[in-house]
Amino acid sequence: FSKKRIESVEVTKIHYDQIVKVKIQLAEEELELAGLIDSGNQLYDPLTKTPVMIMHVSSLEHCLPSWLTEQIYSKTEIPQIPENDSGWATKLRLIPFRAVGVESQFLWAIKPDSVQVDHEGSSIVVNKVLIGLNTQQLSTNGEYQCIVHPKMLISQKMVIA
């Protein structure tokens, strides 16, 4: 068995369309959100192969500098990072993506300080993940605030709760 084949077997064990608790730490702020495990989320950073979870930008707005949220809402594709705030340069990525009925475009993504997913009685610390910042609401009824990439639940460090 190759590692890729074993991971594909593990993916089939995950219950999709399940709501999980997601804890995110970013810029000395901690958020706790409901996340939907979505098999349709196959978004990766093409350079690092890091999985990308999706979140509405308003959920993180209080953690982000105003210049960044303005650029995300205006769909700026070339980041303009102020010199006095250059620490954000190492946390930002632009991820190419396609959605149904939409031409190819870019999604702003940010590298969080830490992410933890509570799934089936275990806490999973996800070290390799990006948060894609979407400008469209994800859930019409507010049931979840982020879309969890299934790869976040595989090959990660499990912490017994």
Swiss-Prot record:
Enzyme Commission number(s) of this protein: 3.4.23.-
Active site: residue positions: D38
InterPro entries in UniProt: SpoIIGA (IPR005081)
Keyword Hydrolase: yes
Presence of the UniProt keyword Metal-binding in the record: no
Pfam family, any one: Peptidase_U4
Keywords annotated in UniProt: Aspartyl protease, Hydrolase, Protease, Sporulation
GO biological process: asexual sporulation; proteolysis; sporulation resulting in formation of a cellular spore
Domain of life: Bacteria
GO molecular function terms listed in the Swiss-Prot or TrEMBL record: aspartic-type endopeptidase activity
Regions annotated as coiled coil: none
Family: Belongs to the peptidase U4 family.
Function: Probably activates the RNA polymerase sigma-35 factor at the stage II of sporulation.
Full protein name: Putative sporulation sigma factor-processing peptidase
Organism whose genome encodes this protein: Bacillus thuringiensis subsp. kurstaki
